[in-house]
């Protein structure tokens, strides 16, 4: 047993290379000669390092990321083109006022052409108004008896007047009346229709009385069927007081012969109101636009509205 221990201790000393153990091996007495190991048979032990400190992995070297060495290609200069604005649509300017030729003198000739050498188609008086179509040099173009006509544009004879427009229907009715200015008055002239839309034979646009003129322009301009006399027309439409009359209303009057009658029998005349005290009607001579006289106002009975 001692021998085995001695071999073991010596072997361990040889393996570990520990001096105290080797010294101890020398003092051990055995009955057999000491075992000698050839130098070539000694194992080579690895260097285990300091057993008290743990082995640390060496930190990995930090490497910078590969950066591209090539410069990025420059973007080509693209010209900035501003989009062209879309053209605005032409919006017609709609006037809210109607233009008229206001007559400043009595017996002003209405001529067939723009000059004194043209034939006279008729005459208008101070305070009357005509439809203004346009100015042609020193003349105003108008419509008279359904024809193109002219009056002097001299400030001594005429000027321009304005009236506020009404609805589209109202203006169409008035336009029909403007065509007929200057047409002679004939009492009892044949009507356009019988009040129910049945057209009558013998009708012509060359003569009118007050109710047949209103019947014609209301039908042509707005398709409205007025009856055949002032005393039946006054029952149509909606009643309007004097203080509320406006452009396009029909104004009904009495006269000297009917002044003392009652009901519809008082009615003896009808006119189309244009505004600012002006009416379009025909009475005793021809169709005209004129201001209401004091007498005409005194004969006013009622107004009727259709628009």
Where in this protein do the model-derived segments appear?
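Sec-dependent N-terminal signal peptides of Gram-positive bacterial secreted proteins and lipoproteins
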Residues: 3-27
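N-terminal capping segments
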Residues: 159-211, 219-227, 262-266
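...with weaker cross-activation on analogous glycine-rich loops/strands in unrelated enzymes
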Residues: 174, 215, 224-289
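Boundary regions of SH3-family modules and the immediately adjacent low-complexity/disordered segments
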Residues: 26-56, 61, 67-70, 74, ...
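Glycine-rich catalytic cores of cysteine/serine-nucleophile enzymes that process amide/ester linkages
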Residues: 123-128, 134-137, 149-153, 183-208, ...
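Beta-loop motif signature
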Residues: 34-43, 90-96, 103-137
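Low-complexity, Gly/Ser/Thr/Pro-rich intrinsically disordered linker/tail segments
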Residues: 301-307
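Sec-exported extracytoplasmic/periplasmic mature domains
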Residues: 129, 135, 178-186, 215-223, ...
């Amino acid at each position: 047993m001692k021998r085995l221990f001695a071999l073991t201790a010596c072997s361990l000393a040889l393996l570990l290379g520990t001096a105290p153990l080797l010294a101890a091996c020398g003092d051990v007495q055995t009955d057999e000669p000491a075992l000698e190991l050839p130098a070539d048979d000694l194992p080579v032990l690895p260097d285990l390092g300091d057993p008290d400190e743990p082995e640390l992995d060496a930190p990995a070297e930090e490497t910078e990321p590969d950066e591209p060495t090539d410069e990025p290609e420059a973007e080509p200069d693209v010209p900035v083109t501003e989009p062209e604005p879309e053209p605005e649509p032409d919006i017609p300017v709609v006037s809210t006022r109607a233009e008229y030729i206001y007559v400043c003198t009595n017996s002003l000739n209405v001529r067939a052409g723009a000059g004194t050498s043209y034939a006279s188609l008729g005459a208008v008086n101070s305070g009357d108004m005509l439809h203004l179509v346009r100015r042609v040099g020193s003349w105003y173009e108008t419509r008279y008896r359904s024809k193109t006509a002219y009056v002097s544009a001299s400030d001594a004879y005429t000027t321009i007047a304005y009236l506020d427009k009404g609805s589209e229907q109202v203006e169409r009715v008035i336009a029909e009346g403007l065509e007929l200015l200057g047409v002679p008055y004939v009492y009892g002239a044949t009507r356009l229709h019988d009040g129910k839309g049945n057209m009558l034979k013998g009708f012509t646009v060359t003569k009118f009385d007050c109710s047949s003129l209103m019947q014609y322009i209301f039908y042509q301009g707005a398709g409205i069927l007025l009856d055949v006399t002032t005393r039946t027309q006054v029952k149509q439409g909606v009643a309007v007081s004097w203080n509320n009359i406006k452009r396009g209303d029909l104004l009904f009057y009495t006269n000297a012969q009917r002044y003392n009658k009652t009901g519809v029998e008082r009615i003896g005349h009808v006119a189309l109101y244009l505004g600012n005290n002006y009416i379009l009607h025909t009475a005793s001579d021809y169709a005209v636009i004129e201001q209401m006289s004091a007498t005409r106002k005194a004969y006013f009975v009622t107004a009727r509205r259709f628009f």
